[in-house]
Amino acid sequence: MEGNETANLCSKSVGWLQKQDKDVEPWLWKLSNCFSTLTQSLPSAGGNPKDYMEHPKPKVELKDVPPPPPPVKPCKNIFPTVPLPKIQPPALPAVQHQTGPKVSCCVLCSNSTSCAPEIRCSGGGYIHPNTILDTGTVTCQVAPGLSFAPESPFKKASSTSTFVPRSAGFSNLCLENRLSPCQCHSQPAPCYSKVHLNPFHGDHPRFQVPALGTSPSYFTSGLSQHVENHLAQSEYLSHYCTSSLHFNTPSSAFLKGPHFCNVCFEKPSSSKVTDSHKIWPNIPPPNTSSAPIPICNGCGTQETVKEAALILAKNLCKASQKYGSPDLATGQMQENLPPIGVFWDIENCSVPSGRSAVTVVKRIRERLFKGHREAEFICVCDISKENKEVIEELNNCQVTVAHINATAKNAADDKLRQSLRRFADTHTSPATVVLVSTDVNFALELSDLRHRHSFHIILIHKNQASEALLHHAHELIHFEEFISDLPPRLPIKMQQCQTLLYVYNLPTNRDAKSISNRLRRLSDNCGGKVMSISGTSAILRFANQESAERAQKRMENEDVFGNRITVSFTPRNKEVNETKNSCVSNEKAKSPKKVNKNTKLCLSIKDDSSSNTKAASKSACGSVSKNSNVKSLKELCQMQSKSNKTSQQEKDKKRNGDKQGTLSQSSPLCTNQMLQTARNVGTDNTASKSFQKRDDTTRKSNADSQKEQKNKEDVVFQISNPSAFSKLTESRQASPFCSSQSGWSSRSLSPSLSNCSSPIATNQTGAADNSVDPFANGADIQIGNLDYRMSRKELQQTLHDIFSRHGKIKNVELSPHTDYQLKATVQMENLQEAICAVNSLHRYKIGSKRIQVSLATGATNKSLSLLSFGTVSILQDAPACCLPLFKFTEIYEKKFGHKLIVSDLYRLTDTVTIRDQGNGRLVCLLPSVQARQSPMGSSQSHDGSSANCSPVVFEELEYHEPICRRHCSNRKFSGHDFDPDSYIIPFVIISLKTFAPQVHSLLQTHEGTVPLLSFPDCYAAEFSALKEVQEGQGGVPLEHLITCIPGVNIAFAQNGIKVVKWIHNKPPPPNSDPWLLRSKSPVGNPQLIQFSREVIDLLKNQPSCIMPVTKFIPTYHHHFAKQCRVSDYGYSKLLELLEAVPHVLQILGMGSKRLLTLTHRAQVKRFTQDLLKLLKSQASKQVIVREFSQAYHWCFSRDWNVTEYGVCDLVDIVSEIPDTTICVSQQDGESVISIPKRERTPEEVERTKQFSKEVVDLLRHQPHFRMPFNKFIPSYHHHFGRQCKLTYYGFTKLLDLFEAIPDVLQVLECGEEKILALTEMERIKALASQLVKLLRSQKDSSINMPDLLTEYSKTFGYSLRLHDYDVSSVPALMQKLCHVVKIMDTDLGKQIQLINRKSLRSLTAQLLILLMSWDESSSLTVEQLCQVYQSVHGIPLNPCEYGFVSLAELLKSLPYLVEVHTNDLCEDSVQLTSLYVFAKNVRSLLHTYHYQQIFLHEFPNAYSKYVGEVLQPKQYGYSSLEEILGAIPQVVWIKGHGHKRIVVLKNDMKVCHQMDKELLCLTSPMDLLCGPVPSCLPSPQLHPDPVVTQPADLIQFEEHFHFSDLVYPEETQYNPLCNGTQPCNFPTSADLDTFSEPSTQNICPQESKSTKELPESPVKRQHRNRVKLAANFSFAPVTKL
């Protein structure tokens, strides 16, 4: 396409069509290739060609023109006629006809002659002839059009004149009626939409031919035969313009070749619809030279060598854009391309941390989407778990992000599989599916897509993908290689500069609040905040320059209470301008590592007037661009309009420069790059380079920015965040009292910089601004007492809904869901709306609780700022920046003179943290605050390692000698030649008791510092050589042993040398706490806390707790079965992560041979836990030191090695444990380690029993009836509304209290975490209670067994885990719950139903009588009670029938009746409570009285005589006799009034059998012979029984009683024990020993007489028996004497 050019444009042959350039797409042609000659003539339809030419002119050949379709509805005239200037055309030579007919366009386009008619399109535009346009290189694009039905007949149109009659909206083509019947060539026509050919003559009718498929054209009737015979439908093509901006613009007709839009003169778009061979038939080249074809003046000039570039007028382009529509060719192309869908399991193949998801999506589209159209791009994840930045990037890339619940199993896989199936249902083959996952679960879907749907499968997978998944893909791409070189996610965000706007001419007759509200309404749309109002002026603050400019336009000359205000960027007072006009960053204080990256300079230029500010800001928006080679018409139009715009800006700038000698720019110019300015001192002119923001739409154009010469101006530099002093600036900006601290200025800023602009002054200004209106940025509303049983999402949505009714909400935040203390903060934009919401929604019910709503006032924030400052000042001076809470409270109140509210400390989340440690709470300063408060940005030795997060901290020592020159044995040592990898860590054996004072003495002689490299030499010179051994031979690393000494630490000097020194650079006080003298343990985030626990668990399983650094990653992977991803913790290197946990991990040595070990603090804590476990495993809770190794082996199943805990002697580490934890004493000359014990009082024991019930109640509300150990105290406080005081139960440690209730609670250890869980029995009871609640809510109180787990999860919010109950199936679990539910077989399958419980009241009476009748002083075991019950009642006692899993649990449910104890043999024994022992005596006493009743006033004396002791109701917890008798309603009741009140024995407790052993064995001191006859004795039998057939003893004396001979009356409705008749002969304990399971066959109850004759109530009068018998008689009717 770049051949030699000739004088004529169309002088080339057709042969170039067969040789396409590989580098150029087949649909892109240059204009010069659009014309050629045809020397081969084709025969006409009639066989003999007819010459219709009157004079030699170029001829147009027609070939294979198909019949046109029916005419369509004409379009309206859209574009107006745009006349172009008339230019006289040059003289055109006559074209000679040679061998064959030649193709030519019309020579002139004259509207004045009849032979040159006007060819108009549906747009109605006129193209005047003789118009010469500029030339240039124009890239034309050609695309084929649409085919039409070949059966459509030609439509004739009458032609009575040389002009074509048409209606608006049709494209007309006028052809001469004397055309030669030759073929029309198939080359493109010129780039001009109105092709003018020779004029028509009126003697032939015209045919209508479609041009664009929408507008018909006309041909003469002389072409009818030729068209019908020689135009093939396959070769007829419709070409049209594909520009979406010119869709409605019609184009002229064509015969073979491209068609062009009459607006932009461009060829159709570059989108290829069909094959190029179909567009351009393979026509042989002509064998004769073609005549030059002149082009009409609309397309170019004759005899030009360069190609014509036709640029339309700018207004015509804009008109076409207004009425633009989607591109037809592009749309058709997209529909014809095969679809492609991407399905991304982002949880399986995640974006690497810190990397850009945009790049991943871009790579997928660039590499896989060629030749396809995007039909689906979806990724599935839990958006609450995924990185928010990744989700935002995916949304910005138009990727569908489907949210699923991460807790549901395979939720993401199910969603993706559903999407794949939907894609297959929507699209057909050919289609492509891209799956980004490694999960084998997609194998089935991929198999169906490939083999059943014939889709092309591309799998992007990780290295560990299964073969079953890989087998179904056509193409495999490794995900690791695909994302190997991803760029980091470093979003360059423009730092916003707060710009001030000054408002003048405000009214003075209105209050400031009204004016502020009016100004806020005017500027609110632009983000303006009213900072202050003074007199007739006000100051408004905006986030950036653009918002301020928009606000200036809107507010200028606005009415404010009758005054027309003026707005300006510059204040009328120049001094105020210098103070206010500074760029203050809105970003939060960043870490010291990131501050330097975000450093910016703000350029402020003084100005006197506000009019020049606007012009200067406009001129800074961009620079003038040079026009280079333009390659498209679109870019030509853009460049033309851009050049016009820039030229106009230059004119304005020049005009402003003439009037005024300086440029003004009041607001700081903030860009995302550092502004580079050059200042020439002593010269008048200052040259500076202007920066222009990159425009995405003009990236393809090569525009060189020009330099501008500016007039003389004053430039003031203001440093908002100077890079060298970033830490200082941030710390002072974060402190509310930075204005009062100026002692650090000598270290922070150089004099020149500090004099230019002070960051402190900027911060003071901001503080003063904030004090004007504390609610300028909105009002915060605190919401408490939220229902923690609701989900976070539901709570957040509910809060948003109810608060949005009262105003606009900025944000709704929920605090972490811990300890039931769920709180929320709602930020509203308007203070009045916030107050209204607080008044309306306080105590509003959400869920099951009423929320507490309060407004976070500015006074509260101020008080918190004061508290924060005071807290920082105290903790900075504390050792390790930590203090116990009580000590901190004492110091704070003494220092500041007012009481400290501890709850306010918990609100300082960005300053301090409060941890539970041991038996108290610890207040610690956060590492970020410590780094900000350090004057040099690096931590002090006593401050620990907050800067580099290492236990070996970087000291402020600038340089230190690597060795001690006085004692080092290697005199030739050179620090430059020293190789750290050659350093070998010495292992020594020495006791800390000996080593510690020697190290302090060594530091004293070396002025407080000793280099670690020469420490052994210095120690040997002062004392004796250390005993060094090889690793693993019982030694401890010397470096670790030194850090075990209180007050001594190892620090890094600036030159990287480790130095042994004192922590406070002086010897520690003699009585100081050793723990406060150790290196600090910084407080980390929850991720680091978890990582520190993993490090402890990992290292304690290593030999001597030592591991090389190089083996950490593989060991971690092997131990935890997961990768240690450093980026998850916010670090880029492993060493940085290891240094971030200095309180548990110590890095020993230098170079590549460094070792990892646990710190001494972590070792002591670990040994304490192991020692307590060992002591508790001993029966005596103590161990002799001499037998310690043996006891250790029995407890932990491993040999004792003291070096496992980082010391060389047991005494060294035992002495570190507090005396409150263990006790070391001397017994018989032996050292004994024991747990200190204290005897608890009975009150404390009772409280502990009550505490056990509270623990059960609390854990029943927890998922799976368990909770973390560290959550118990706050949960207890929240649940019961009171503190859990350990001293109330007689303990000092919570764990000891838990160990005192082992029957209900067990403490599980999961690594370093402790979990509280109910015992198995309590879990079953709790689950039974839940099942009762669940079944009662179901229909018919039953549920199908398969639905149990689902309904349980829906009801209680968590799943039912069968393994918690040691079962693997639901039926097995139901067997353990047989006392609550039963399984029934129904028509619908197996159902779970509630059992019908028996009445516990009757059983209680039976058990009470059995226990009261037990005649021995020893307690009765539960098993014996079961045997007695079965022997007396004849049926076994089944506690499940009463809803209890065991009889012991049933008895425990009667705590007011009986007490259940566990003896040494682990047997449960039962006995009556002290109150019911009294009831037993009362029952026995009343049995001695007639009618079993006694007067109340006689009861005390009778009881004292019967029992032998005086009755004292207070001994039982009652104040009077009536109260204690009323406390045993099951035994007695009081009837009557006044002095006639009588104590009556209940019928259930009466003795109704003559064989009453109690009467025979009474031990009462009273003489029974002198007393009344007992009413229970029957009268003598006056009427003998019938004659018996067998001889028998009529009197029925029996010497031995057997249980089978007992007689029981019939049962009544109330009492199954026969209407109060109770057996009174019970077996003794000796009988129970020989008693086997009784047989019910031996029990033969006799029939009794009618119960009507028996005494039922003491009220009913009965006759006395005058005969007293001491024998047992059979039942007989009672007769009167």
Curated annotation (Swiss-Prot):
SMART domains documented for this protein: RRM
Keywords associated with the record: Differentiation, Meiosis, Oogenesis, Peroxisome, Repeat, RNA-binding
Domain named RRM: residues: 779-858
Pfam families for the chain: MARF1_LOTUS, NYN, OST-HTH, RRM_1, RRM_MARF1
GO CC annotations on file: peroxisome
Biased composition (Polar residues): 638-647, 659-690, 1637-1648
Gene Ontology molecular functions: RNA binding; RNA nuclease activity
GO biological process: meiotic cell cycle; oogenesis; regulation of gene expression
Domain called HTH OST-type: residue spans: 863-937, 991-1067, 1087-1161, 1163-1238, 1247-1321, 1323-1398, 1399-1472, 1474-1548
Matching InterPro entries: LOTUS-like, Marf1, MARF1_LOTUS, MARF1_RRM1, MARF1_RRM2, Nucleotide-bd_a/b_plait_sf, NYN, OST-HTH/LOTUS_dom
Region (Disordered) location: 576-595, 638-717, 1637-1662
Subcellular location: Peroxisome
Keyword Cytoplasm: no
Main location: other
Compositional bias ranges of the Basic and acidic residues kind: 648-658, 692-715, 1649-1659
Positions of the NYN domain: 340-477
Domain of life: Eukaryota
Function: Essential regulator of oogenesis required for female meiotic progression to repress transposable elements and preventing their mobilization, which is essential for the germline integrity.
Protein name: Meiosis regulator and mRNA stability factor 1
